[in-house]
């Protein structure tokens, strides 16, 4: 039975905007607010783990104790134990969210191709709000940090932040044409950077002034507000909605069909190669990002909350500078070569950071990475252009799974490697990340060169 509102005449009528925003503004506030909450929560959660685990083992250290040991080459054994415990608990907590979220995203993405994008944008916002509520409960009751896993489990069931990313990028793919898609995707990623920069600056000062509780209340409120924004202000982008069951194996089939059905122009091979490139890029990005705070907290940098906030702001500023650079270089270069320039920027910055022993050198490394985030919009856009309109949700859910797997690899590899290499080179994980980035740089360059060869052969035949 079809309700009156679902009749073709009513469904095709233009619907008025439900909020006072320009028509060109769609899901940008969703990704901005969600990233703001995540960027505010992330460094504070790491610092809370440090403080709680320090108290549990009786380390009254403050991190400046290890920094003031007569210029000693390394921190004391207690501080190294705290670093190791913090890195390991970060691994356990992130692992819990990934394992649950992997199956949720594989269901929700293809489901959104049928029922629309709005439900899969609201659900993870609510899940992230509940996660913040669990974190608040742990802090109020001073429970063991292992209870953070409950919050990550709840967030994972609802799709987590990766589902918000997938939903927003699929939405932009729905409403943009092929020519403007790369830049529209880059705008979304710039929203990630601006939100992260603002949250990082606020978070450091706020924690220093009032502790952890009040910032996490803001995280809770922002996630709830984002869900309300989606409900009242985001118009549906899927043109032909139809009812569909959520829990069915067909969604998994749609997911895997992308990589098993051979399309035109070696589509399957290119999807696999671009996904592999994205896997490595995001693994290095997440792995380095997870360690930045821990690297800055400990000897020899020994940053306080203010400097950590400025460092995180500098890291997120790369999203904005990469957007400007992408727009500029697109005027004279193909997207693939713009991505190659992003790799050069990222690799050089990570090498400098791996050797940083003073604050100016650390910020120099951040500065060299000014164009580092130009690679991911190019890869997302190329992936989106390879599939049909009705496959965007399945595609970006696969991208979300790749990013979730990247997060798992990043936390497993980098968080385990960091304590294992403390005794000979603290910055070794960043150096390893720079080397790993040579793999996607080679993949993207090779595909671009191979795609140009037929064009040259056609010219030679004509001549």
Swiss-Prot record:
Transmembrane segments: 28-46, 87-112, 117-139, 145-158, 182-207, 213-231, 271-293, 307-329, 336-355, 360-380, 393-418, 427-445
Gene Ontology MF term list: folic acid binding; methotrexate transmembrane transporter activity; symporter activity; transmembrane transporter activity
Keywords, alphabetical: Cell membrane, Cytoplasm, Disulfide bond, Endosome, Folate-binding, Glycoprotein, Membrane, Symport, Transmembrane, Transmembrane helix, Transport
InterPro entries according to UniProt: MFS, MFS_trans_sf
Glycosylation sites: 60, 70
Gene Ontology annotations of biological process type: transmembrane transport
Gene3D superfamilies documented for this protein: MFS general substrate transporter like domains
Cysteine-cysteine disulfides: 67-302
Membrane-protein topology: Multi-pass membrane protein
Gene Ontology cellular component annotations, sorted alphabetically: apical plasma membrane; basolateral plasma membrane; endosome; endosome membrane; plasma membrane
Record: residues binding H(+): 160, 189, 285
Extracellular topological domain: 47-86, 140-144, 208-212, 294-306, 356-359, 419-426
Sequence ranges on the Cytoplasmic membrane side: 1-27, 113-116, 159-181, 232-270, 330-335, 381-392, 446-463
Catalytic reaction equation(s): folate(in) + H(+)(in) = folate(out) + H(+)(out); (6S)-5-methyl-5,6,7,8-tetrahydrofolate(in) + H(+)(in) = (6S)-5-methyl-5,6,7,8-tetrahydrofolate(out) + H(+)(out); methotrexate(in) + H(+)(in) = methotrexate(out) + H(+)(out); pemetrexed(in) + H(+)(in) = pemetrexed(out) + H(+)(out)
A Pfam family of this chain: MFS_1
Places the protein is found: Cell membrane; Apical cell membrane; Basolateral cell membrane; Endosome membrane
Family: Belongs to the major facilitator superfamily. SLC46A family.
PANTHER family: PROTON-COUPLED FOLATE TRANSPORTER, ZGC:174356
Function: Proton-coupled folate symporter that mediates folate absorption using an H(+) gradient as a driving force. Involved in the intestinal absorption of folates at the brush-border membrane of the proximal jejunum, and the transport from blood to cerebrospinal fluid across the choroid plexus. Functions at acidic pH via alternate outward- and inward-open conformation states. Protonation of residues in the outward open state primes the protein for transport.
Subunit relationships: Monomer.
Protein name: Proton-coupled folate transporter
Organism: Xenopus laevis (African clawed frog)
Lineage: Eukaryota, Metazoa, Chordata, Craniata, Vertebrata
